[in-house]
């Protein structure tokens, strides 16, 4: 999984469109409410597997980010995977970020980014492997 296939959507036209069984385009929209949204097919696959494993909805705190929004986001990486549609910051009610990260590690043992934060887990499908605590 390397995020190679990234699709571009318009929230105005596609916001209610299902990108998978449990996720809609609008869930990945940048917090600045820009219309364009980039979403990686591989990322959606990982999120669906996480949802199936825990048997609970996965909530996306932050999906796609525009360059402008990312530059205003505290502690965001200059080349954040969110800017390319390859990342999501997620939480699951009743599941710790550490538990989410442990399962994501099984899905992405040699690739992808997994970051553990106090209230969410960052998951991305970059080609290289990266792990951190926020």
Segment roles from a protein language model:
Residues 5, 78-134:
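Catalytic cores and adjacent binding grooves of peptidoglycan-active enzymes
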Residues 33, 37-44, 63, 67, ...:
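Generic alpha-helical scaffold signal
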């Amino acid at each position: 999984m390397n995020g190679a296939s990234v699709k571009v959507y318009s929230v105005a036209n596609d916001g209610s469109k299902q990108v998978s069984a449990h996720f809609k385009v609008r869930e990945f929209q940048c917090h600045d409410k820009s219309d364009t949204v980039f979403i990686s097919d591989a990322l959606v696959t990982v999120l669906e597997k996480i949802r199936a494993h825990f048997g609970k909805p996965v909530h996306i705190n932050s999906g796609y980010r525009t360059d402008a929004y990312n530059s205003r986001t505290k502690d965001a990486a200059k080349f954040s995977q969110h800017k390319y549609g390859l990342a999501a910051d997620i939480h699951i009610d009743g599941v710790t970020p550490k538990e989410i990260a442990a399962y994501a590690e099984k899905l992405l043992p040699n690739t992808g980014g997994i970051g553990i934060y106090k209230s969410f887990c960052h998951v991305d499908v970059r080609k290289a492997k990266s792990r951190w605590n926020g």
